[in-house]
């Protein structure tokens, strides 16, 4: 059974100084999907982000990279979702995930924010509705919680970056399966992938 996702959000901090930091991994999925579909993301002030629209299996899929800072991502998601009447369960949010190693990606529906400020704000701005989908992109963990802020805002070493980019590419392919054949099949594909 196909899965109706109408909005894919890639979480990021704005500005060139953050573009290649681990915290922006979610945005790389949206950028890659736009590139594959030959779509240019445009700045939309009313949606507080970069937006685009693609067709996947005959259905509209809106793309959004908030240009607010990470902890205000919910403002952009809420504005676009309200305008296009998109329900929380029709949204997928791609984000960096400390609890997975680089090169691993996982799809998930619902759940908490796991300390991720972008997810926290989206949940809050959706009236505490947590039922949106997540695409969790592993970036690894620095080993101690006091090091997390510097770690997520830092750039990954070349080998780790290659692994993250490989799972971004695989996520785009798996997302196509999710939209056509549903979540379990997409999970089967993505969850068995490991970039080395």
Swiss-Prot record:
SUPFAM superfamilies assigned: Peptidyl-tRNA hydrolase-like (SSF53178)
Annotated site, Discriminates between blocked and unblocked aminoacyl-tRNA, chain positions: 13
Any one Gene Ontology cellular component term annotated for this protein: cytoplasm
Residues that bind tRNA: 18, 69, 71, 117
Chief place where the protein resides: cytoplasm
Site (Stabilizes the basic form of H active site to accept a proton): 96
InterPro entries: Pept_tRNA_hydro, Pept_tRNA_hydro_CS, Pept_tRNA_hydro_sf
Enzyme class: hydrolase
Active-site residue numbers: 23 (proton acceptor)
Alphabetical UniProt keywords: Cytoplasm, Hydrolase, RNA-binding, tRNA-binding
Enzyme Commission code(s) on record: 3.1.1.29
Catalysed transformations (reactions): an N-acyl-L-alpha-aminoacyl-tRNA + H2O = an N-acyl-L-amino acid + a tRNA + H(+)
One Pfam family here: Pept_tRNA_hydro
GO biological process: protein quality control for misfolded or incompletely synthesized proteins; rescue of stalled ribosome
Compartment(s): Cytoplasm
GO molecular function: peptidyl-tRNA hydrolase activity; tRNA binding
Subunit structure: Monomer.
UniProt xrefs under PANTHER family: PEPTIDYL-TRNA HYDROLASE
Record function comment: Hydrolyzes ribosome-free peptidyl-tRNAs (with 1 or more amino acids incorporated), which drop off the ribosome during protein synthesis, or as a result of ribosome stalling. Catalyzes the release of premature peptidyl moieties from peptidyl-tRNA molecules trapped in stalled 50S ribosomal subunits, and thus maintains levels of free tRNAs and 50S ribosomes.
Entry-linked NCBIfam families: pth
Family named by the database record: Belongs to the PTH family.
Protein name (Swiss-Prot/TrEMBL): Peptidyl-tRNA hydrolase
Organism for this UniProt entry: Vibrio atlanticus (strain LGP32)
Gene: pth
């Amino acid at each position: 059974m196909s899965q109706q996702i109408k909005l894919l959000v890639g979480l990021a901090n704005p500005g060139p100084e953050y573009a290649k930091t681990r915290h922006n991994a979610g945005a790389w999925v949206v950028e890659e999907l736009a590139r594959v579909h030959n779509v240019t993301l445009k700045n939309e002030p009313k949606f507080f982000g970069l937006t685009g629209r693609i067709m996947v299996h005959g259905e509209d899929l809106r793309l959004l990279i908030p240009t607010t800072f990470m902890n205000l991502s919910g403002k952009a998601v809420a504005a676009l979702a309200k305008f296009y009447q998109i329900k929380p369960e029709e949204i997928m949010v791609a984000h960096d995930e400390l609890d997975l190693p680089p090169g691993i990606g996982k799809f998930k529906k619902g759940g908490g924010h796991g300390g991720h400020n972008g997810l926290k704000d989206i949940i809050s701005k959706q009236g505490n509705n947590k039922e949106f989908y997540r695409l969790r992109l592993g970036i690894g963990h620095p080993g101690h919680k006091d090091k997390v802020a510097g770690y997520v805002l830092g750039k990954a070493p070349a080998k780790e970056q290659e692994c993250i980019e490989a799972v971004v590419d695989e996520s785009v392919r798996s997302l196509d399966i999710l939209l056509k054949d549903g979540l379990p099949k997409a999970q089967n594909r993505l969850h068995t992938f490991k970039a080395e």
